[in-house]
Amino acid sequence: MSGAKVYCAALVVLVLLSAGCNGSKMKVSGQVTFSDDGSPLTVGMVVMESGTTRVSGKLDGKGNFRLGELDDGDGVPFGEYKVCIAGCRETLPSGFPGEYLIDSKFERPEHSGLTFVVKSDGPKTFDFKVDRPTKKLKLK
């Protein structure tokens, strides 16, 4: 076998072996609950953004989420993130969201006040508390 073929074969093996390594990512999960009574937010999504990365995870019926770049739970690159949380009942046939379950301040990372840092020696679980929507004034 020529030197070039050996090099290419070794490179392929190295790439295949490293594909399973997750040195720069961490599995991250957590739960979203309401600040007033501790009950879980059971519908919605958690989205985290850094300058270059966006990860997300859907909430399950107990308010739990697993984060990932491509799929829920595939891991989060190390770094500092701003967090936003979406929570509404379901999308209406008109395409508009249904009833909002959380305060609108949580919809945008720059307004939510929620952040977290993912690092190799840091926590792997991040729990968030959200407020219910503020009451709307009724016009008479």
Short names for language-model regions:
Residues M1-A19:
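Sec-dependent bacterial lipoprotein signal peptides
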Residues C21-K140:
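Beta-strand-dominated extracellular/periplasmic modules and repeats
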